[in-house]
């Protein structure tokens, strides 16, 4: 089982360094990322925006987690955008995340 805090720290390290290897080891080959609008990205598209820069995440809070899923929140700091908070629901199998869904809310 991969804990929420572990994968979120790896995700931020990827955003900071633009090096996807920090995060890639936690994601399955058939990984899907679903954004707030319901748009789905595969592993390659997720890699593209992760290594593009201009985005950081912090203030990780785990709600529940177990060997099958995590639910957590984190803040987002993105160049040119107001501060925002994200709710994450993610599913994992054998320590690799297969699905990651976010709901993002911006400060007014």
Question: Across the structure, where does each feature detected by a protein language model lie?
Answer:
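Short, well-ordered alpha-helical segments enriched in acidic and aromatic residues
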Residues: 17-30
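A beta-strand edge to alpha-helix "cap/lid" segment located at domain peripheries
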Residues: 34, 40, 44-108
């Amino acid at each position: 089982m991969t804990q929420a805090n572990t994968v979120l720290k790896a995700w931020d390290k990827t955003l900071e360094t633009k090096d996807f290897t920090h995060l890639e080891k936690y994601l399955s080959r058939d990984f899907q990322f679903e954004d707030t609008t319901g748009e789905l990205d595969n592993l390659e598209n997720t890699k593209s925006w992760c290594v593009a820069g201009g985005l950081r995440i912090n203030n990780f809070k785990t709600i529940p987690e177990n060997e099958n899923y995590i639910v957590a929140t984190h803040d987002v700091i993105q160049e040119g955008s107001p501060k925002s908070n994200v709710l994450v629901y993610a599913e994992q199998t054998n320590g690799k995340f297969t699905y990651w869904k976010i709901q993002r809310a911006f400060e007014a």
